[in-house]
Amino acid sequence: TKEWYTDPFADSLNLENIKSEDIKNYIINHEEVHPTLTKEQEKAIAYAHKYCGAAADEEDGLMFNKKYKDFNGDGGDCANFASQIMYESGRFKKNALWNYEKGSATKAWVNAQGFKNYIINSGRGSYIAKGGYEEVYREAYNLKPGDFVGYEKKGRITHVSTVTGFDSKGYPLVTCHNTDRLLVPWDLGWSDKAIRFHLIRV
């Protein structure tokens, strides 16, 4: 059940950049977006930014929510954090399959693969797109705050992150644990053609 996680920024340093000129032009020429947010989306953004461990606000910087166990020592905390965002924002209630209580969590709550499978199989989420970067980058512009991205390597989801904003060209930005990130590009710098992205609406 452990989800040993390699920082994708480091993983991409020695890999060829797959962003072609066509892709670069598409990204550069895309318009800024100003989505109308629901109360749940506003709460998801606020929670993610406060407890990501890399917050810009000095008061909240480098802090996780102490109400929850930090699962980094057990293989990774990314799915735990994504689950927290969904629960604390009021998006979903806990149940027998997706649950955290007194330092213990179900696989669907704390494991990246289990989390993705549960959200899809339960009907709580649906696919926007999945595939390599060149296959999904256009569809990524359909991501909204509170949606999440799963990162598949060698057939398994090894990481998840939550959409919490956009850059000046409308490129979705994510926030996550492992390694702690605040408002970074949704592709996380992964340029390995073996990586598949799962873009999921919740």
Language model feature labels by segment:
Residues 1-26, 172:
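Short beta-strand edge/turn micro-motifs at domain boundaries
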Residues 7-18, 96-117:
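Acidic/His-rich structured neighborhood in mature extracellular/periplasmic domains
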Residues 22-109:
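N-terminal capping segments
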Residues 76-84, 160-164, 174-175:
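Active-site scaffold segments
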Residues 94-98, 160-162, 186:
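Short, solvent-exposed loop/turn and secondary-structure capping segments
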Residues 98, 151-154, 176-179:
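Active-site-proximal beta-strand/loop segments in catalytic clefts of secreted hydrolases
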Residues 103-173:
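...with weaker cross-activation on analogous glycine-rich loops/strands in unrelated enzymes
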Residues 171-181, 186-202:
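Low-complexity, Gly/Ser/Thr/Pro-rich intrinsically disordered linker/tail segments
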